[in-house]
A protein has these predicted regions:
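Flexible "cap/lid" loop of the alpha/beta hydrolase fold
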Residues: 117-118, 122-154
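Conserved serine/cysteine hydrolase catalytic core
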Residues: 191-235, 244
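Conserved alpha/beta-hydrolase catalytic His-Asp/Glu region
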Residues: 137-139, 154-210
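Gly/Ala-rich beta-loop-alpha elbow adjacent to hydrolase catalytic centers
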Residues: 104-108, 112
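Active-site loop/oxyanion-hole signature of alpha/beta-hydrolase fold enzymes
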Residues: 23-25, 51, 63-103
Length: 285
């Protein structure tokens, strides 16, 4: 059962965030740039976008949040309800115009999709990756939430800094590994997995009026599930699309930050996606 069905809603939850603003012209009293909120993956924090944002900060107001249960927002239990309500409060109180573009990776993508479903009036567009509803063994594995949480907890304690970064094939980002390790608790992981397995394509069919790009990292994400998710999204809005970046791993904000940022910029601006983003839907899908 999802949190939406089982927990009473809370209002005005305040999640931690970092604001990155373009340089202001002398005399400007407040930013007139579009706002993008970045939502990180499970176990992680806002630092995972450290290599992406330098390609965007000249042209956008950027808010990098720590999702409930994670890092600076650890005091707020993770649930989709809490994440949606905290994001809604953040947008209404901290964003000029009260509407944003959202970028989400993995868990952050699932949160972004839930937010678009429940608060579409606050969303200008959504760009999300690694967040198609799970099927087959991927769904079964995450449904074993206590067991999987325990395995990740133990593995996180055993993995050295060198092993952690070598497994991703990327250069270290200062501070990120420590945050991931601190977030790898059963208290956080179990509710994350319980929420993830509650997500269905029927949920996606309830999203109205939001232009969404859903993307698969070709090396690790399930491309077929991404196609099916894209079809459902497009059935509700012909401007939605699905893509695969063939060389991307799941956590590719670390691996291909410039390509990641190029796709975000294109989607936000409504321009043609870079060629490395291979469309997965036909014109009539």
């Amino acid at each position: 059962m999802s949190s939406e069905e089982s927990n009473p809603k809370q209002a005005d939850l305040e999640i931690a965030y970092t604001r990155l603003s373009p340089s202001q012209n002398p005399g400007d009293k407040e930013s007139s740039y579009p706002t993008i909120i970045f939502l990180h993956g499970g176990e992680s924090c806002h630092l995972e976008f450290s290599r992406v944002t330098p390609f965007l900060t000249d042209d956008y107001e950027i808010l990098l949040v720590d999702l409930p249960g994670h890092s600076r927002s650890k005091s707020i239990p993770f649930s989709f309800d809490n994440a949606v309500n905290a994001l809604s409060h953040l947008i209404k109180t901290q964003v000029k115009g009260g509407k944003v573009h959202i970028v989400g990776l993995s868990l952050g993508g699932f949160v972004g999709l839930q937010f678009a479903r429940r608060c579409s009036e606050l969303v200008l567009s959504l760009w999300c990756t690694g967040c198609a509803p799970f099927s087959g063994y991927r769904h079964w594995l995450r449904s074993q939430s206590r067991l999987l949480s325990g395995i990740i907890f133990v593995a996180g304690r055993l993995a050295t800094e060198r092993i952690f970064w070598a497994s991703l094939g990327v250069d270290p980002i200062p501070g990120l590994r420590a945050e991931v390790k601190n977030n790898q608790t059963i208290t956080l992981l179990k509710p994350v997995f319980d929420e993830l397995v509650s997500v269905t394509l029927e949920n996606f069919a309830e999203i109205q009026g939001v232009r969404i790009a859903i993307i698969a990292g070709g090396k690790q994400d399930n491309v077929e599930d991404t196609v099916e998710a894209g079809k459902v999204l497009r059935s509700k809005n012909p401007e939605c699309n699905a893509f695969v970046v063939r060389k991307a791993i799941h956590w590719w904000s670390l691996q291909l930050p410039e390509v990641f940022a190029q796709g975000v910029r294109a989607w936000v601006e409504g321009s043609e996606m870079p060629k490395v983003y291979e469309p997965l839907l036909t014109a009539v899908s």
